[in-house]
């Protein structure tokens, strides 16, 4: 209905790639019990269900043998809405060691771990009526 507008404004906006910069760094603790073939993963994930499925797939374990615990997270702002590689590595190391492994990423590693929001161009056309 832009044809009926009294004022039309069209503009293109460019947004650079954005990396999430939440205060809380990425961290995970995984504990493997070899005698029971069970894994418990504590992670800052925002998607424990997806992490659970991905751990089972990556480790080749039955999902019933994996437990994911998601503590209170101070804020991920979209950074943790998918399983991240450090969570898989922590779990794999715990299983290989037959015990417990803790991983905490540095700020630089947090930026490298997640792809962030991609560079975007938005073309917008607005029609305003008096």
Language model: regions and residue ranges:
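Structural alpha/beta core scaffold segments of enzyme domains
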Residues: 1-130
């Amino acid at each position: 209905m832009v044809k009926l507008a009294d004022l039309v404004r069209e503009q293109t906006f460019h947004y650079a790639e954005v990396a999430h910069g939440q205060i809380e760094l990425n961290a995970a603790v995984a504990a493997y019990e070899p005698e029971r073939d069970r894994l418990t993963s504590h992670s800052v994930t925002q998607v424990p269900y997806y992490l659970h499925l991905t751990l089972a797939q990556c480790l080749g374990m039955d999902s019933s043998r994996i437990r994911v615990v998601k503590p209170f997270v101070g804020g991920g702002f979209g950074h943790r809405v998918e399983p991240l590689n450090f969570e898989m590595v922590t779990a794999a190391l715990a299983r290989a060691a037959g015990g417990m492994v803790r991983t905490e990423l540095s700020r630089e590693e947090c930026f490298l771990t997640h792809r962030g929001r991609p560079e975007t161009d938005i073309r917008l056309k607005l029609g305003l009526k008096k």
